[in-house]
Amino acid sequence: MSGIAFVEVRTRAGQEDRSAPWRPVVRNGENHATFYDTRMGNFDANPFPPQTCQTCAASLTGKYGNERCHGHFGFVGMPRIRPGSAHSDSDRLVVLNPHLAMDADRLFRAKCFFCHKFRAPTFDVERFRQALVLADHGLPGDALHLLDTVPTAKGHDAMLNHRRMANEEIVNDVSILQSYVDRILRQRASGCSEEDAKARVTMAQKGTVDVRNDICNMAISHLRSFSGPCSHCTAISPTFLKRGGIIFFLFRKSNLVTNIAKGFLTQQEVSEWEAVNRLHGRTGTYFDGRQMLFHMKNLFAKEQAILGLLYPNLGEPSVFTKTNKVVPASERYKLFFLDRILVPPLPLRLSSGVRVNDNGLIIPDEQTRALSDILGFVEQIECFHTLSANSTNGRSFITDAQRAVNESNLRNLQQKVDEFYAEIVNSFAKKEGLFRMNMMGKRVNQACRSVISPDPFVEPNEVLLPRPLARALSFPEQVTCFAPARMNLLKHCVVNGPRKYPGATHIELRHANGEIRSVDLNVPEQTRRQHAARFFAMAQSGVTLIVYRHILNGDRVIFNRQPTLHKPSMMGYRVKVLSGSKTIRFHYVNGNSFNADFDGDEMNVHVPQSIETRAEVETLMDANINYLVPTSGRPIRGLIQDHVAAGVLVTLRDKFFDHSTFVQLVYNGVGPYIQENVGITLAELIPIPAILMPRPMWTGKQLISVMVRFSSGLSAASDCGREIEGGITLKGTSQIQPSAFDRIPAGSCDAVRAKSGAVVDSTVMFANSELITGFMCKKQLGASNMSAPHHVYELYGPHRTGQLFAAFGRVLLLALRKEGLSLAMDDMFLVDEERRCDLLRKLDDIALDVPDEEATAAPMIADYATKIQQEFVPQRMLVPFPKNHLLLMTISGAKGSNLNATQMSLQLGQQLFDGLRVKRMNSSKTLPSFFTNEKRARSFGFAMGSFASGIRPAEYTIHAMAGRDGLIDTAVKTSRSGHLQRCLIKGLESLVVHWDRTVRDSNGSVIQFMYGGDGLDPCKASTLTAWEMMKDNVVDVSKRFGGDASESVAGAEDGAAAGLKEMRNEDGKPTTEAVQNAHMEQQLSTYPLPASLDKSLSEYLCKKADFPLFRKVSTLARWDAKQQLKERLQQRRQKWVGAFEKTLADITARRRLWALCEPGEPVGLLAAQAAGEPSTQMTLNTFHTAGSTVSHVTEGIPRLRELLIYASVNKAAVVVPVTNATEEDEKVIAKMLRAGVAAKLTDCLAKVTDGAGGQSASSSMQRNLNTGFGKGYHYHVARGRTGMVITVSFLFSRSCLEELRKRMCMSPSEHRQSFTEALKNVVRLIMRSLSAVPREKESGDGSGNTGGMKGGSGRADRKRKRSGPDDGGGPLGGTFGDEIMRIEEGTDSDDGMSERSSIGGGRAGSEVSSLHSDGTDTRGIAGSDTGGPQRRRGSVESGRGDDASDSEAADPDLYARRSGSPARDAEDGGEMQDRDGTDWGGTSMQGVVGYDNFPEIHMSFTKSNFGAVIAPLSTAAAARDGVVQLHEDFFIVNAVLRTASDVIAVIPDVVDNALEAQRMPSWLPQFGSLTFTRLKDKGSGQLVFQGPGSTMRNVMSFLSLFTVGIKSIKLHQACSTDIRDMGTYFGIESGYAALYDELNKLFNRYNVDPRHLSLIADTSTHRGRWENFNFTGVISTSASPLFQMTFASSKRWLHRAVSRGMSDDLESFSSAIMVGERPRVGTASVRLSTDTAILRDVLERNFA
């Protein structure tokens, strides 16, 4: 710091001279610098005169100093201990460095307070040191293995992670450990040179940064957690406390006594600490800076070895200069403290907003104000030390109050320093911070922005720029004497100046000595002429002259629309400047690339500022070149709307043009290109007319053919009588099918079919660029795969495709102007309106007879609506197609869809909200205009009206609601998808294809050994297997890509293929071509054609390809007469197959080499864009698709966030395929379906809903609402002064329990134990909700302990003891890792009571009538208050006026009696022998399990006033308490809960939640739901496991018990939607495959190339675990701290980089952009060289 800051500021803000604040303030004969001292930079603030930097003036030549001075640092010194002494500057107090405060606190907690070593044993310290040594040598695996296998001194790690391999030596001594590591290092270093070893270590260290950081964190955590006496000196260290950044230490009294006894402390020291603490009113002792410095110095001196590895680069300067030096390891402790605070340079602080008030006082900025506050505390502390220095033994100027104030000042000084540094760090963080706002998003000068407009007459790769924008932008062009014309143009621009077009803004002169001079041309014209004459003469004498001219026609610019979601959103264009234009104009064909709709959108234009960049824009970024989108490898550019409609109108079979119109259309289309093709005239392009008499007429198909033939490089040679070779040949389908021409007359139900011509035109066929049949609809003119423009792109290149689009656009627009296209009301009317109304009435009533369920009614309504739509649109339209322009637009794909036509003419249809119909309100209505519980389709949002007929107010309301819901969904989805794409961009930005075809990240780690598995570029490989295109166009494909031969069809007598002719010239070749051919042959041998492609080609040629097997029908007749027809046809086909197979294989091999992804390609960015751009189209919310195999599965953006952002799945599902199941297998599956679903305790309750004792339904309803009766339980509350007693009586059904027992495959005793454990868990959950008790303390007696149980209960009990009641599943459910959560699905049992049974009759019924309104009777089912009226919520009763509450809550005996203890009723026939639970009675006399005779269970909790008793109520006890006529299937279990008197809760909600969450423990793994979804094939389907416990381990364990010998259940094909579960159970490769499959399912409909998805999946799993694309996953593993700081949590990454002294080699994109470095990608990943020796060496090595 002393090397960059030499101006000490000693004057607080506000104390400077108001007239000259930069002048030093004189105090005691010393000059004290102010915060505005000019030695820290230029001072320029109104109303003061500007002052130059004195530091620059002293070091630079000239009296004016440096006008561009950025300033110099000053500093604020910490308090001097002896202010008046000569060495006061070197003896200062220190404060803790805020950046390293956290690390210092950890070290203080880990060290011994007395011997200043780590308290942990030496072996533990050496263990971590050797692990770091291995990591630094590039051996992270060995380092982690060392920590796993070598235990600590106490053997903790060995017990938890016992992974020692067989015959591995035991390391338990420091010397053995050191020799063990040395041996590993020697083994790894053997066999390689020293240079290779260093290179290997350097490369490995970059990829192991995260492992090293993990080891450092583990080491510090372990050393800090070591408790007890020091292992070296046996002293006991204090406890450190940190409050507000201040550290205190505190000794326990017992520890003080021990340390004093051992001599580590004296009583005097302790007394001094206690006196100071009493003075400040605290218990801890302040740990001041001098004490911290002393302790840290000794720690670094004694633990230098381990600390040097924990902080390896700490103290190293980021940039080495002459004044910088490396801090030795023994002095690195000084970096944890600060003795001075840097003051930012003066210009930086002045630019932050310095203001001057009316009194002339400078109002400082935030940083200056904070530094001034620090300086104020420094002055106060120095005053204290001055008084202390002047004090003597006989006379002291220091009082206790002053000492207290001084300590307070010291603490405040530390806090102010922390706040100052925190403000600096916060300026980096978040979106508005310096990293993301300023350093990542750079402002560019040569750019403009304006509104865009479409222009069909401009070229597709041209942009029309308004002249004002062209004058505002400039391009630097160097003047060269070898181009006189260009030199004269630049001289003319200089003379015109910046205001006249074409002109120039300024010129730049670069001399040979490196001097650069800039001359502004905003001067008078005469001066500009002089500049032009003088400087252009200098250009001829060796001076480099650069003219910054205006943008001219032909310049290249980058056109961009935000948001830039993918690569085509930023493309290169050729400029054409227009004087009258006010907006930026470009062709329609580019709208889809930018997602621009010309409704006021604005776009950006960037002008490249170098010749190299301009060349890259022209050759790599040109709009024509970006015809295919990297997301899918399919076309993204295409004509839209009016052009498509015109294409259909032009290509109708009855469309003809006369000569003048046809020639005019042809000239408009290809006129701009005729001059470029020498030798082709307009007359040669006109074909023979289709109709000769009575006058020549040409068809629209001929017009299209002329455009395609011209783009294919062919002329109209069809009249020359010779056969045409070349031109595109394709066979595709049209979007207009023959059904569009069908009509259904009024009053009829039979459709009148289309004519044969319409059927023929439904197939688009080109032969040698001649359109034979078909309509030019969206499939041919739009952005469609394998369309005519796509064929032109693949065969003739991108620029021919651009010409074709431009010609199509001009021709079709001019033709449409002649034809016209408008929409009339007749186009929306139907023929048979009465039938429409009748069918819609039937649709409205169709849901009346079906259950009111979404899954039943909605599909039925949708199917019927679809049938109506198919009948009416387009068959029953008043104006038929193609005269109906509404149908013309929707069917051809020009605008809208069939749904829009249906809504305009027929009906609006069903309105959906998140995929569901509108729901009913609390009034059981969907809208006030409908009836209660109405089930008609209209009431659920089906709009019967159309836009032509009008809609009703209710339909309008629901339609508006659905539109609003969609807008909200879009708004939320935009932010979610934007964050998703940003995370993907950051996580994948550094993935680049390297020279060896591998994909590596910035760390050098290999992500993929071959990009995408095959190394092919998605755009280049999109048509690699388009065999039909290659076969039909083999001549042109061979011309473009080369090959040994291509097909040549000659007219042989038998019509067979005449053979193959050579396409290459075998004469003398130039050297360049020879080298290229040699390189191609070498590459073909290195990368041969894969067998899969060869097999695919053979299958196509043998099974799918069509060949002309004959030319004359007479030939067939002759073969048939000789009975050789089949044989001859097969022979001819085999000849064609043989002729094509070798040729196409050779071409495909060459095309595959050409399609390999180029080194330097940023495939990571392309993959992130491919996944991020379609995510904007995904639905946001979770939805359930009808018929889906896995229901309730998160889809869309939430699912993507689970997979990529969080790497955690909320609702996992395991799918197991089933194929060809037999009847026996079906029985096993049915058994599994019953046994696999988790049984809930609420399924066993007898839910009584009828009134008892002849009571009315109303009274029964009141009872249900008040007491929970009807839910299967009853509760009662008794409140007293000392506590509250809650009695919950559960009514269970024996038959339901027995059915569950059979379903769960358990013995009677096991199931009874499961039942009691479930009861205990329910009580735990209730008590936890009431008292917030985290876990049960202990059981009151032996009866509450259920003991062991078959099926692994001991293991379950151990897990329960370890996990507590949070496991939810009890001691058995916890075995399978289940957690307490709401179960989604379950099986509800019947009520379990016959109609003749009743509860509470007789005595209970008579007592109900005598109850008072204040609830004086408090007995429940166990007593006689069956219908006792309580408050509305039934949760808490008042203790006042209740004669039973106080005594009941206070009397423990009464509390025990309320539980209905069986011990009290043993004489009533119970089979219980005692309370110890030694004999549970087995089963009852009826052979059913005795669920009602278990011993009472006592439970106590951590709070003494909380407890519970669970006991069954015997039949005799129930009868004695008033419960009569209890059905023999039912029994009652009482749970009496004792809580504090101040507990307030809604008892029904608490009990309901506990019952719903509790499952019956089972020895079998259990799941939330288990379904079998059948497929179309008989006996085939899928087993789907969902809910808690749906893991692969549980599913496999469950299936292994049922599938022995069953082959139909494919266990090896089981798959889980939880990627981590798959990776843990099967291995990380299985996790990768599962993640890839999940991504493929999500992006399948968006045609995302599999290579992108595989790269994303590989990036997420390549480190052996499933990592997210967030700061806790992929981002955290990067070795670039600058890259991490630009993502999120800047403070965290900055602290780690500073504390660990991490460096950044700028390999990542973000780090390179931050510092202005060119990212090493694309053309920047290679270096161009003109050295002929290098070229000769390459040629000799590869082609000699």
UniProtKB/Swiss-Prot annotation:
GO BP of this protein:
DNA-templated transcription
* Enzyme Commission (EC) number: 2.7.7.6
Keyword Transmembrane assigned to the entry: answer is no
Tell me the segments the record calls region Disordered. 1333-1484
* Biased segments, Gly residues type: 1341-1354, 1366-1376
- Annotated positions binding Zn(2+): 56, 69, 72
Gene Ontology cellular-component terms listed: mitochondrion; plastid; RNA polymerase I complex
**Which domain of life does the UniProt lineage start with?**
Eukaryota
State its location(s): Nucleus, Nucleolus
Q: Where is this region: Bridging helix?
A: 953-965
Which UniProt key words apply to this protein?
DNA-directed RNA polymerase, Magnesium, Metal-binding, Nucleotidyltransferase, Nucleus, Phosphoprotein, Transcription, Transferase, Zinc
Query: In which residue ranges is the amino acid composition biased (Basic and acidic residues)?
Result: 1464-1478
* Pfam families documented for this protein: RNA_pol_Rpb1_2, RNA_pol_Rpb1_3, RNA_pol_Rpb1_4, RNA_pol_Rpb1_5
Q: Which Gene3D superfamilies match?
A: 1.10.132.30, 2.40.40.20, 6.10.250.2940, 6.20.50.80, RNA polymerase ii, RNA polymerase Rpb1, domain 3
| Entry PTM | Phosphorylated.
InterPro entries membership: DNA-dir_RNA_pol1_lsu_N, DNA-dir_RpoC_beta_prime, RNA_pol_asu, RNA_pol_N, RNA_pol_Rpb1_3, RNA_pol_Rpb1_3_sf, RNA_pol_Rpb1_4, RNA_pol_Rpb1_5
Q: Which reaction does it catalyse?
A: RNA(n) + a ribonucleoside 5'-triphosphate = RNA(n+1) + diphosphate
Quote the subunit structure annotation.
Component of the RNA polymerase I (Pol I) complex consisting of at least 13 subunits.
Similarity remark: Belongs to the RNA polymerase beta' chain family.
Q: What does this protein do?
A: DNA-dependent RNA polymerase catalyzes the transcription of DNA into RNA using the four ribonucleoside triphosphates as substrates. Largest and catalytic core component of RNA polymerase I which synthesizes ribosomal RNA precursors. Forms the polymerase active center together with the second largest subunit. A single stranded DNA template strand of the promoter is positioned within the central active site cleft of Pol I.
Identify this protein by name.
DNA-directed RNA polymerase I subunit RPA1
Which organism does this record belong to? Trypanosoma brucei brucei
